Amino acid sequence: DALEKKASVYVINRENVVWLCEKHHWDFDMIVIDELSSFKSYQAKRFKALRRYRPKAIRVVGLTGTPGNLMDLWAEIGILDMGQRLGRYIGAYRDRFFLPDKRNRNIIYSYKPRDGAEEAIYNLISDICISMKAEDYLSMPECLYHRVEVRMDEKEEKLYRQMEKDMLLPFEDGDVDAVNAAALSGKLLQMANGAVYDENHKVRHIHDKKLDALEDLIEAANGKPVLVAYWYQHDLDRIVERFKAVPLKAAGDIRKWKEGKIPVAAIHPASAGHGLNIQDGGHILIWFGLTWSLELYMQCNARLWRQGQRETVMIYHIINKGTLDEDAMRSLEQKDCGQSAIIDAVKARIGGVNGASRKDD
């Protein structure tokens, strides 16, 4: 109905882009894409649909705080200039600027930039791209990052090392296993948090070290509202059980948080993305479990650290020493959170364990 009305500006969410392109007569002469990174997949329907109708628009503007890696730029820039700078085909772009990295004979799993590719790509797109940091142009509060380290006891660490080495943790009524490096990454991060799903999706308790650290941080907040970022459902269940935390899912709960009426709230990074304004409710964010996604990490942090925040933002990361937590944190800090970074981290851990066990033998 809204499209039938005459207006200067129309607003639509990205989930309806395909519908808009296929069902509506295209008569827009300008397109503004908020969060251009959501069009970084050249295989996605929304990218293909918008690319098909892009020539009908005179001007296109794309906004994003997380453009991704060099490979992602092909689709994002292609939406803007219709392939003028980086080429019309992903294959040609890949051949020109990248080399195969991880492969199994003819199967290529990842690519790495050629020498000088990064500078060359940036030079090609520099005339249509501008980078601005919010803190350089807006009144932004200070943001401080902290690490809080925990360590498992000998019995708990033994279980972790067994899973790391064998990719299997046997129980009488259901094993915890991983079929590949990516799956093992998920299992190890779960165990670092304190619990893990077995093959029957039953939760296996490992330790409470992170819950204890979270309790200390909540007490140190001295009554100020705390927002806890979790990744796995069993993390949320344990946080809710111990601290009576309120998940920020319903509109009513979000409203109460913004009014300062929720002492401990929990949020999943995937639901804390673009456009959620909750900075009025607090200034303390605690990462109970980490993610490999730099975009989700940055967007979640930006829910509190943004214009309108009146306090210094405190972001804590609870890190389990000697676990994959350290690798995930390092990847986030180095802004290297691709699939290859995950696999490299797991392989390095496995290699270290297997090497140590061979020496013991």
Regions found by a protein language model. Name each.
Residues A2-M30:
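Conserved helix/coil segment N-terminal to the catalytic DExD/H
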Residues K6-A7, F28, R54-I58, I77, ...:
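Short, well-ordered alpha-helix to beta-strand connector turns
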Residues V11-I12, R59-G65, A265-I267:
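Structural recognition of the conserved hydrophobic beta-strand(s) that form the central parallel beta-sheet
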Residues N13, F39, L236, V246-K335:
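Conserved RecA-like P-loop NTPase helicase motor core
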Residues M30, F47-A134, Q309-T312:
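Conserved P-loop NTPase motor "coupling/switch" region that bridges the ATPase
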Residues D34-E35:
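Walker B catalytic acidic pair
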Residues S38-R51, L294:
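Substrate-gripping "pore-loop 1 plus following alpha2 helix"
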Residues S139-G281, I343-D361:
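Conserved Helicase C-terminal RecA-like lobe
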